[in-house]
Amino acid sequence: MKAGRDCSEEEHNRGNPSSPSFPREPIAGGLGTPSHSHQKERFIRVLWFACALFAVIIIFFILAFLLFDAYPIFLEIGIWDFLTGMVWNPTGIPPAYGIYALIVDSILVMILAMAISIPLGIGSAIYLAELAPYRVKTIVKPAVELLAGIPSVVFGFFGLIVLTDWIRVNFDVPTGETWLAGSILLGVMALPTIISVSEDAISSAPREVREGSFALGATHWQTISRVVTPAALSGITAAIILGIGRAVGETMAVLMVTGNAAVIPDPIWNVLSPVRTLTGTLGIEMGEVAIGSTHYHALFGVAVVLLVITLAINLLATVILARIKEKHMAAKTCSAKVAGPREQQWFAGYVQKYRNVLIGIVLGLGLLAVFRWIGLLAALLGYSAFRLIQGRISPKWTQRVAFSLILFCILSVLFALGVILLDIIVKGVPYLTWEFLTAPPSNLGRSGGIFPAIVGTMYLVIGAI
């Protein structure tokens, strides 16, 4: 009966406009009404679209500006002669505007920098994601990311004072401002990006794949190398591409330590030769060139070439990532493989096992015949020998060697960070005085302080934010 009375009351209230439970239409234009929410959503959508459109317009005008000022040099000299000319001497008589040596030097510096940073970066990322205890990780990871907060000019200053002097003394060369110095510095600068992105990619690998690998009897290193790392390959590839972008686009640090000689190293593997990059050329000459001159337009041509190289790297990265994802999805959807005759399986297994040895020998012999590059041949043969005996080493010993190399990677990164910070602190802190921080410079910068520079930097930062 009580339930019946409640139902009757509810029906009565629904039909009574004065009842609190009577459904009411929202007031038009009021806060929280559908019309107001729709207008707010529409306004936000238009605002975000305007922001995106503004960014696109800015980029378009930058590209148009570069192409407009670079066109005269392409018209006067020709694109082919500009790209393949061996001499860059804008102040000579007659002037020469060939950037082939600049392109080669930029690529060489980038390749050696990546050869340094990729193994150290991926090894350090594996340590942080898979091997480091929690307390160690909470200390080491922020320390590694601290490298990303060091300005490039500080890296360049350290390289100019410490690194070049070390190269000059240890390699007995007239100057330490070389290709090697620039690549080492760029490799260290690219490490934080590669480590952070790779570590995130490795850590995001599903836990189930690790547990499944362990359940099948795999060692920790076999799980990392054959299961976790392939699962995180797209993220690791993205990290490498970002590192390459940092190496290609860096200006100040490279400008300060490479010697800035627009020549191709002779022989090509002479890492102790001075070089000049595209970015270094822009940084050195743009501030002193006469506006509207041929030299001025040639520098804009250099900027366009640098832009094309960067764009090509990004497009290549997009293609590689797409292929990796496509291959990964195909591997997931493929449930079984068709097995052939036993002899074919044996031959395929044999080729799979020794293919690296065969490739190493063939490449080594080819390079020996063409370039007579004994060092590279020795490296290839050493790698081939390692792959040959790898199958005969127990998994536990392989794991010990691999973990030792990974530990060496993270210790090398921390050593580089420690050396840079220690040099800056030891040489800089004693000169930090109140007068130095609050006084303007005097005597043509030989005395006084840096207060105007601090204020100007803060203005730039606030304006950028």
Regions found by a protein language model. Name each.
Residues 30-47, 67-113, 133-134, 284-296, ...:
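Periplasmic/extracellular loop-to-transmembrane helix junction in inner-membrane transport proteins
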Residues 199-210, 214, 287-338, 382-388:
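C-terminal transmembrane helix and the adjacent membrane-cytosol boundary/short C-terminal tail
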